[in-house]
Amino acid sequence: TRETRRTPALRNKVYERLAEAQTLAEAKDYAGAAVILNDMISEDGKRALNSYELANVYNLHAFLSYAKEDYPQSLRYYEQVISQPDIPLAMEINTRFTIAQLYFVQEKWQQGIDALLMWFEMNEKPNAGAYVLLAQGYYQVKRYDLALDNVETAIAMHEGEGKLPKEQWYNLARFLYFDKEDFDSALDVLNTLIIYYPKKQYWVQASHLYGEKKDEPRQLALMEAAYEQGFLDRSSELVTMAYLYLNAE
């Protein structure tokens, strides 16, 4: 069950100053927006704000830093947002996801994974994109089994909803199957890629895998299909196809 929180109100005069800073930020006057926000959290100002108001000030500060591509500073402000007590649960959940993304942007993979796992614990309905993000994190730290589990989950979720998973999701799965020498699963993924994202590399690689499995008829059929689409532009590929024809006779 979801915890209930008693979030303090955002008072009108505070809201008006935040709106003023927001308007400046949208006009890309980041310095002007920062002046207002810094005044709000100066020694005197800070004492007058409740936790939810402070969280909103830090949240807008984080946005300003992000807009200037100062990711470490943006991260520090987002950490301040979630350190405020009794902020709305949705605000904390969204901020935790942003924190994870910011770690990944800075290639701090393990911290990103840890932040994302904390987000997963709080989120009742994680989406497929979050599982892919986690898979990419695990891939970067070479935890390939965990990467595969998560990208498989994402693909299954999307397919189950009648949506087409992204090409890069399939490619991550394909790489991970190859790495563990699960060539049957790699072939399944390649055959899916051929249907939805037909590119030369998928036809040629699938043909090669059928060759590894000593399934020459399929190996030849895929090379022929690639040839008919004008994909075979290297002489070595045409030689391979000629050999397959000779063996097939």
Language-model segments: residues:
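Residue at a conserved register position within TPR or TPR-like alpha-solenoid repeats
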Residues: 24, 65, 103, 138, ...
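TPR-repeat structural position
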Residues: 30, 71, 109, 144, ...
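N-terminal leader/linker segments that initiate helical-solenoid repeat arrays
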Residues: 1-79, 91-94
